[in-house]
Every structure is written in C-alpha cells, then in structure tokens.
UniProtKB/Swiss-Prot annotation:
This is Light-independent protochlorophyllide reductase iron-sulfur ATP-binding protein. Its cofactor is [4Fe-4S] cluster. The lineage of its organism: Eukaryota, Viridiplantae, Chlorophyta, core chlorophytes, Chlorophyceae. ATP binds at residues 10-15, 39, 180-181, 204-206. Component of the dark-operative protochlorophyllide reductase (DPOR) that uses Mg-ATP and reduced ferredoxin to reduce ring D of protochlorophyllide (Pchlide) to form chlorophyllide a (Chlide). This reaction is light-independent. The L component serves as a unique electron donor to the NB-component of the complex, and binds Mg-ATP. Pathway: Porphyrin-containing compound metabolism; chlorophyll biosynthesis (light-independent). Its main location: plastid. HAMAP family: ChlL_BchL. Keywords: 4Fe-4S, ATP-binding, Chlorophyll biosynthesis, Chloroplast, Iron, Iron-sulfur, Magnesium, Metal-binding, Nucleotide-binding, Oxidoreductase, Photosynthesis, Plastid.
C-alpha cells in the first residue's frame, strides 16, 4: 500500500506522518517513509537528525545509479521505520516532481521500492502543481491533514481537486481527512457535509504534539518516558487500523473557490452574529 500525505504548510503533516508510520509498524507492517520536501526534515522525528537526501547522494555519485547502495540513502528510524529524503532542486530552479521521480527510480534500481508493505510519501505543503502532485501517481490513497480553520480547509479542497484529477488515470482514492490539534470540528463538519469526505481522526489540541517536533522525537518514543502521553497513541493506531482495512475511499468532488469561500465565511459570520445575540440576551437579562 502506498500513501501520500498532503495538507496546508505548517499544519503538522510530518509529525502526523511519522506517528502514522510507527503505528503501521506497530501493526506488523514493514514501512518506508519518503520525505518529499526540499527542507528534507520529514523524517527528523524518526531518525533524530537530517539524513542525506537522494539528490545529494546522486550528485556525489555523478548520477551513476549503479554506484549507489541501499545504505547510502535508506536510514532506519525509531520503531523500525525506514526513512528516505528525496530532497529538492536548487531554490528557484528545477522541479520537485522530477526529484520525486528520481527517488522512485533509484529505489526501484535498488530493488527496494517493492520490498515494503507500506510506503508513505510526506509531501511539501499544499502545493498542487504537476510537480509536487507527482507522489499521487504512485499512491493508492491520499490523506489530507487539516484543522478546523479556514485556510487549512481551503488548502484541503484544492488538494481534493488534485486527487480527483489524478483519479482519472490512476487507481487513487482519498482515504480521508486527519484533523490535527483541534478542540472543535464544526467547520470541518460543515465542509464534509457539502463535499463528502471521511474524517479518519480528530487529534487533540495537545502541546506535546507540537513539542515532539522540536524534541526530534515521535509521540511513541516520548510516551516511553512520559506514560501520560500513552492515550494519544491510540489516535494514530486508529488511523493505521482504518488504513489497513483498505477502505473504499472517495473520489472527491471539490467545491469551487467562490462556493467554498462563501460556505466558510458565512459559517464564521453566523457564529459572530450568534455570539452578538447571546451577549445582547445576557445584557437584557441583567438589565431586567
């Protein structure tokens, strides 16, 4: 099974991806996580350091694939999850899709691409150009990390459009949304009512999820020394269990930009109006 994880920049895709990878490994699967971001920090919480990228390694070998060995590019991280960082082209030049293609090509040359039960692509931000949509060419399922906010859902809608487009020519489905670090899901529910997409999980608004990134550890590793965090692991294990059932998924029908803007902005305005009414009612009560 091949998964591609997308979402708005800064929403917590890499943190979510790493914990899902470990959850899948805990279920007995052999997992490879491929970071598809020029920052090459997708697997940082798994390995504890920034591993060399595929592109850096190929450049050092003058692009002689026959001189590259698996141990040059594949690093084992926490929980037995293997890690690869694709890297990216120089700033302002090249195409990220080409880099992803070269990564897959090299892994196939090394006979590594088909050795894993699960390959998870953790993809740069909410970029949905043809280049960074390239991992969708290889994926069975796409997951979108979001929160209960306007910007994240707007990005999710654009990514859903990319999934629909790729699904025309590839056996790709959208597995669902993962809401990261939120106490509410009312705006998410409003969106999925109009654009039916499964919600796989709603992760709690827990500061330790954000701090884990700074510590360079996954929540699974942190929980070994902080037992109070053990309850959070069940959220990721639940996502893993749903994915392992090979869900039907959906080919989404995204909303038009103006339609989505109207839907989400009306939701906020209605909340503000309702809040104003409630304040007035309370004030009248006290005046009486």
């Amino acid at each position: 099974m091949k998964l591609a994880v997308y979402g708005k920049g800064g929403i917590g895709k890499s943190t979510t991806s790493c914990n899902i990878s470990i959850a899948l490994a805990r279920r007995g699967k052999k997992v490879l996580q491929i970071g598809c971001d020029p920052k090459h920090d997708s697997t940082f919480t798994l390995t504890g350091f920034l591993i060399p990228t595929i592109i850096d390694t190929l450049q050092a070998k003058d692009y002689h694939y026959e001189n590259v060995w698996p141990e040059d590019v594949i690093y084992q991280g926490y929980g037995g999850v293997d890690c690869v960082e694709a890297g990216g082209p120089p700033a302002g030049a090249g195409c990220g899709g080409y880099v992803v293609g070269e990564t897959v090509k090299l892994l196939k040359e090394l006979n590594a691409f088909y050795e894993y039960d699960i390959i998870l692509f953790d993809v740069l931000g909410d970029v949905v150009c043809g280049g960074f949509a390239a991992p969708l060419n290889y994926a069975d399922y796409c997951l979108i990390v979001t929160d209960n906010g306007f910007d994240a859902l707007f990005a999710a809608n654009r990514i859903a459009a990319s999934v629909r487009e790729k699904a025309r020519t590839h056996p790709l489905r959208l597995a669902g949304l993962v809401a990261n670090r939120t106490t509410k899901r009312d705006l998410i529910d409003k969106y999925v009512q109009v654009c039916p997409i499964p919600v796989l999980e709603v992760l709690p608004l827990l500061e330790d999820i954000r701090v884990s990134r700074v510590k360079g550890k996954t929540l699974f590793e942190m929980a070994e020394s902080e037992p109070d965090l053990s309850f959070v692991l069940d959220y990721y294990l639940n996502i893993a269990d749903q994915l392992l059932t090979e869900p039907e998924g959906v080919v989404p029908r995204e909303l038009g930009d103006r339609e989505l803007f109207s839907l989400l902005s009306d939701f906020y305005l209605n909340i503000e109006n309702q809040t104003s009414v409630n304040k007035t009612e309370k004030l009248d009560f006290f005046l009486v």
